Amino acid sequence: MLANQLVTKLYPEILRGEVCITLLSNSPDHFYKPAFMYVAFNQFFDEELKRPERSLLRPEIDFRVDEVTRFDFAGQHLHTRSGKRYGYDFLVIATGCVPAPERIEGLKEAGDHFYQYAAARQLAERLNAIERGRIFISVSFPKTPNVPHQCGIAPVETTLMLDDLLRRRGVRDKVEIIYTYPSVAQLLRNCLFMQRPVGEALPGIFEQRNVRFQRDFTLGRVDPERRIAYSEEGEEQPFDILMATPPIRAVDAVLESGVSQAEHDEGWLPTNHETLQVYGLQGVYVIGDTVDLPISKAGGACHNQAPVIANNITAEIRLGAPNSVYEGRVQAVAQMGLNAGMPLWYDYAHDVLPTPPSKLGGLLRTGFNRGLYWAVARGML
């Protein structure tokens, strides 16, 4: 998305041979990661959620499948797995984050999540097999203050999708669903969601669907043999399936760069909340999940960050200084069950204002999942 937007902005300079754009990736394929959530409910499969990266890029972009293993910011070079070294004048770090369930004792062994394809397929098999019991949902935030977990609305979405799935299977009356939220959720305390308006709307939604909910359950450890989740607050919850939003961290190369000031070695890069430059590094920008900003680590954030960075790099080349400001804008359509959707948007100054879920909203989300996303990735929307 961003590379394509840079080509559009800098096309005259590219034609004159004054600018070249290189994209380094650790995979030849581009994955639509928000669809991993749907994999857990048998609505997406591997070939439906990926495209060859090259097919999404403008021909002017030099695309290389070569994973970055080390950043040399002082020398303005990148070292890669192949042993090559790439120089840069401007760098955009878009390495995302990775689930780290091993950071909570027992969670890797006993928990399931939907933030990677293989993990989501495993969860799908367990959800398809359960006939009775308890499905326990937990959410873990980063330890870095005021940094959200990956895709903030996803635990709510999957809870409601789970309710629909079990009803379709005819076992909902035999399976208990328990949604929990930690004591500290960015700037909020004792809540069910990290933004107050949505959190206040959730009890009514959950009660209508007979979903139990509990505030102040910060997952501390899991006993895989007894299948019990223990909270830092001293409570315990037995489960048959533990559907977790696990801890997350930056990728190894970012962790090892020494630039992050985040607590507990999480690796988030110190980001200027307006320009999206990395503090203390000349010509380096960051987009998406690796930022230390208080906004959602989700595609709806990247969609709004990309044009800001494209404008700022273009302005630095032509004018000598960045000229665009990111206002914290995020938009998405939340999946409120298997068929319903809820459009939402927010920014630094405004919280999400929940609206009634509808089938029209669900159709909009389906259209984005199945087609519009690939136009966004090409920089067309």
Feature map (PLM): residue ranges:
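Beta1-alpha1 glycine-rich phosphate/pyrophosphate-binding loop at the start
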Residues: M1-D62, N146-C191
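Glycine-rich phosphate-binding loop signature in dinucleotide/nucleotide-binding domains
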Residues: L15, G83-G87, G234-Q237
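A Rossmann-like FAD-binding core segment of flavoenzymes
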Residues: C20-T22, I61-F71, D163-E266
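FAD-binding core/adjacent interface of flavoenzyme oxidoreductases
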Residues: I61-R168, M243
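FAD-site-proximal beta/loop scaffold in flavoenzymes
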Residues: K108-R132, R226, P238-I241, T245-N304
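Rossmann-like dinucleotide-binding core of oxidoreductases
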Residues: E131-Q208, R212-Q214, A298-G328
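C-terminal, flexible cofactor-proximal segment of oxidoreductases
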Residues: A310-L381
